[in-house]
Amino acid sequence: MAQIKITLTKSPIGRIPSQRKTVVALGLGKLNSFVIKEDNAAIRGMITAVSHLVTVEEVN
């Protein structure tokens, strides 16, 4: 299955609690931290919820 790299590019400070919890659930902490996750519907939904805070790249 394909993998994606998710990078936190904007701070979740001042955002609504559900968005902050989504960032933590993705495994992101500090700015410019990144995680590599499997590309599935659940992860894509989480990315959509915080798309204004993260950038996403395909990983080979």
UniProtKB/Swiss-Prot annotation:
CDD domains: Ribosomal_L30 (cd01658). GO terms for cellular component: cytosolic large ribosomal subunit. The keyword Cytoplasm does not apply. HAMAP family: Ribosomal_uL30_B. This is Large ribosomal subunit protein uL30. Part of the 50S ribosomal subunit. NCBIfam families: rpmD_bact. It comes from the Bacteria. Belongs to the universal ribosomal protein uL30 family. Gene3D superfamilies: Ribosomal protein L30, ferredoxin-like fold domain. The keyword Ribosomal protein applies. GO terms for molecular function: structural constituent of ribosome. GO terms for biological process: translation. Pfam families: Ribosomal_L30. InterPro entries: Ribo_uL30_ferredoxin-like_sf, Ribosomal_uL30_bac-type, Ribosomal_uL30_CS, Ribosomal_uL30_ferredoxin-like. SUPFAM superfamilies: Ribosomal protein L30p/L7e. It comes from Streptococcus pneumoniae (strain Hungary19A-6). Keywords: Ribonucleoprotein, Ribosomal protein.
